Amino acid sequence: ADRKSLLINLGGGVLTDIGGFAASTYLRGIEFINIPTTLLGMVDAAHGGKTGIDFKQLKNQIGVFNEPLEVLLDDEYLKTLSKEEFINGYAEVVKHSLLTDKPDLTFNSLIKLDLFKDSDYIINSYSSVKNEIVESDKYESSIRKILNLGHTIGHAVESYSYISDKVVDLKHGQAIVIGIITELYISHKKFNFPLKDVVTVKEHLKNYFNLIQLEEDDILNIYDLMVYDKKNEGSKINFCLLYTSDAAD
């Protein structure tokens, strides 16, 4: 391969993250395209130019911003997935629905859809939510930070599952669901985000995900991992919190 080579990343979110990072650093950068094969990749991970790898059980500690030449979407790949892997990507769909103010894409509109029958519409519609945000803030200096809803806690929970004997190897989506619900509750306590909306989101997600119970020592260990979150500023742990269903801070 040389500097004019093109790397094709065909696979799920982990593969497009690693492949994008490899392309971005090989010979100081070659072009790449992403062809995501999971719902998670199609609506979120393959878009936006964030590339990276985990380091010492910590999420995305090494990486760069570099957008792919193209992201090619084909929902036929979803037919190859187990039901569990298919659903894994739904956490990011719900996140996007909570961040948009477009009436036909809000959470209340999303829950009227059938995840499996309406997958093509869901992929195209909710990936566009992320792409529009990224287009206005490619390097996450301002508005793009809202895409981290659920991820400060979610990434720490996911990292904890790598090292814990009690919470073992959670999928990304399941960890992010825990993060979304918890950060919505923090939004309620801090900014008076409606508690009834927190409950509605939680009850809906319970239809798709097994919400694990965390004990006090688990929570303390997860907090310790949050200290390493890449969004932090000094000793300050940063969250994306909501005032309403269409506004984030």
Spans of model-derived segments:
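Conserved small/polar residues in nucleotide/adenosyl-binding loops
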Residues: 243-249
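Short alpha-helical scaffolding segments that buttress acidic/His motifs in well-ordered protein cores
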Residues: 90-94, 122-133, 147, 180, ...
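N-terminal small/polar loop signature for handling phosphorylated ligands or for N-terminal nucleophile
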Residues: 1-33
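Active-site pocket-lining segment
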Residues: 170-209
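C-terminal charged capping/lid subdomain of soluble metabolic enzymes
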Residues: 91-94, 193-242
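Oxyanion-binding "anion nests"
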Residues: 115-163
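A glycine/threonine-rich phosphate-anchoring loop and its flanking beta-alpha core
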Residues: 20-113
